[in-house]
Amino acid sequence: MTVKRLLAVLVAVIIILAGCSNSKDNENSKQSSKSNNSDNPKTELKVSAAASLSDVSKALKKEFEKTHKNVNVTFNYGGSGALRQQIEKGAPTDVFMSANTKDVDMLKKHNQAHNTYKYAHNQLVLIGDKNSDQASVKDLKDNEKLAIGEVKTVPAGKYAKQYLDDQHLYSDVKDKIVYAKDVKQVLNYVEKGNAQMGFVYETDLYTNNERTDKVNEIKKADLKKPITYEAGATSDSKFAKEWMEFLKSKKAKDILKEYHFKV
């Protein structure tokens, strides 16, 4: 074999070996990356939140996760009373964000909530069909309905009943009332025409931070006491504590105000 041929063979062998080495290094790098990812999975932070928080909670999650890259905040929405009952029965939850103070206080009394904080206020409003000119629940006709949340499990339902009692209107409309599992269902009933009026929170009139044109706000239903939202940690997770601290921050308060809550 000539010297030139020998050199050509040696060069070819070197190139092949180098290619194999690079391929192996790349494979090892991929395996290492996969291993690192699997070694550091995101921690789930489970938050049970009142249905009226379904929009703003997503904005709060986005802001919180900016500084907690290894946390995935998930939400379970419903009426505050129903959520509290789930927690009492052992449902896995790290934070409870209620639309009242009563349900948080009940958990706190039984050592099922701690680090509590009153983080927002809201306004009850009476809504009706977008084309309606009715001004009060007294204007409801015999076959028309008034939707409110379940009084025992939905704070907005309790507030609505309280308002009707305070205004001496309950006896006039009690036979027209249809009950809903949460305020979002009340809104849906009025939007779809299943009820001609309903009581919801002012914040429920906004979707994706835009005011709905599907219903008409008839009037604000002022109560003797303000509607106060309270939250509490329901597990010993360090991220539950950090979420509670986050709710006290200026950033969280600015987000709540942006979504029409009062802080």
How would you describe each model-predicted region?
Residues L7-I14:
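Sec-dependent N-terminal signal peptides
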Residues M1-L7:
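Bacterial N-terminal signal peptides that target proteins for export
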Residues I15-G19:
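C-terminal motif of bacterial Sec signal peptides marking the signal peptidase cleavage site
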Residues N70-I87:
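Central regulatory/effector-binding core of bacterial HTH transcription factors
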Residues R84, G90-N100, V104-K118:
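Short beta-strand-centered segments that line the small-molecule binding cleft or hinge
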Residues V47, D55-F75:
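Short alpha-helix C-terminal cap/hinge motif
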Residues N70, P92-T93, A195:
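Short, high-confidence coil segments that cap the C-terminus of an alpha-helix
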Residues C20-A59, G81, N100-T101, K109, ...:
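Exported/periplasmic ABC-transporter solute-binding proteins
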